[in-house]
């Protein structure tokens, strides 16, 4: 594939970019996975997380929300010895905290997908950046999502992390305009006009 988005640096990046990033997702398990992985990525490269993704799936019960919500302090201590994940206590504990928050979100909103997608009106925002460097780090929508997730007790859900989650799960199409994946994701997601970038 020619003219991929310029953030793609490795083969793992390329596979993720070509097959998953920006594709609209309404699957609660996948959305929970990306919520946890985007939080784990804070301060690290995304390539580091992609290289540990299989380890995360094994360590966190294939991202079954109810299973992770039942993790005990003993289970958390064992995870902190697992080289297959980022062994940061706050991040590991946040995965369990966030699973319990997602349970409450599902009870109140029917699904995690319904809750998350409500912040873009149920339809992906279609941007058309000439370069990925032009894309914002956060928007009014990610600010609102961050605030709402924090209200449920979620951790590692700042606005920048939330915007990365929105990009990853297709709530926002931030593929570069010249990237072949842009048109494919746009066709999958509909035609909502691009939102203006948040003022700095």
Feature locations, PLM:
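HhH-family (HhH-GPD) DNA N-glycosylase catalytic core used in base-excision repair
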Residues: 1-200
């Amino acid at each position: 594939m020619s003219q991929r988005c310029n953030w793609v640096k490795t083969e793992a990046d390329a596979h993720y970019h070509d097959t998953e990033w920006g594709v609209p997702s309404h699957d609660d398990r996948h959305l929970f996975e990306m919520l946890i992985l985007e939080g784990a990525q804070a301060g690290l490269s995304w390539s580091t997380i992609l290289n540990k993704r299989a380890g995360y799936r094994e360590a966190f019960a294939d991202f079954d929300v109810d299973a992770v919500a039942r993790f005990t302090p003993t289970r958390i201590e064992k995870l902190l010895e697992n080289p297959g994940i980022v062994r940061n206590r706050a991040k590991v504990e946040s995965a369990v905290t966030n699973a319990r928050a997602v349970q409450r979100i599902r009870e109140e909103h029917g699904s995690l997908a319904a809750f998350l997608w409500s912040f873009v009106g149920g339809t992906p925002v279609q941007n058309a950046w000439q370069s990925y460097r032009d894309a914002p780090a956060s928007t009014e929508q990610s600010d609102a999502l961050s605030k709402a997730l924090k209200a449920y007790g979620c951790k590692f859900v700042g606005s920048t992390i939330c915007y990365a989650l929105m990009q990853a799960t297709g709530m926002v199409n931030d593929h570069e305009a010249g990237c072949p994946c842009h048109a494919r994701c746009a066709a999958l997601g509909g035609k909502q006009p691009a939102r203006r970038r948040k003022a700095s």
